[in-house]
């Protein structure tokens, strides 16, 4: 049996502009209100992921404190806020999750992902950055991170990372940038 993934717009029953219950499928990417004519296009959410290496070439790895993938390995990062650039978003997320201050970012690549939040499948475009931090003294697990630690790159097993895009990103980083 082939299981079709639910489209995120399936949960939207009312027009976000006028509130009418006349919000119908317009095409694969949008819904249209038959009452006011408003068309809403579904777009992905922007997220960031940080590769942070210390002076010994070890990677900063975090353990997820919350679902999805609670207890699995992760890298610092998260959703980009409404008026942030990717660089600003990754710096803020690194600080919120680890206490480390990012002083330089270098964009590497992006990967699509899905993130199940409160039963709602959020589609994301995850931007991967190499980040240099001011110093390593303030490292601590905060926000949605249960633990953070330095791990030798040669001992990293991408399969231990719980989120698909992070797992694939770690594989790519180890292959292309090591």
Question: What is the meaning of each model-derived region?
Answer:
Residues 1-11, 156, 170-177:
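A broadly conserved sequence feature marking short terminus-proximal activation segments
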Residues 2-5, 54-96:
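Conserved Nudix-box catalytic region and its N-terminal flanking loop in Nudix hydrolases
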Residues 8-12, 29, 46:
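Short metal-coordination and nucleic-acid-contact micro-motifs, chiefly zinc-binding Cys/His arrays
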Residues 15-18, 33-36:
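Short cysteine-rich clusters marking metal-coordination/redox-active sites
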Residues 23-24, 41:
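Short functional micro-motifs and their immediate structural scaffolds
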Residues 35-59, 79:
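Conserved N-terminal beta-strand and adjoining loop/helix that marks the start
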Residues 109-137:
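Active-site-adjacent beta-strand/loop module that shapes the phosphate/pyrophosphate-binding cleft
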Residues 140-170:
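NUDIX/MutT-family hydrolases
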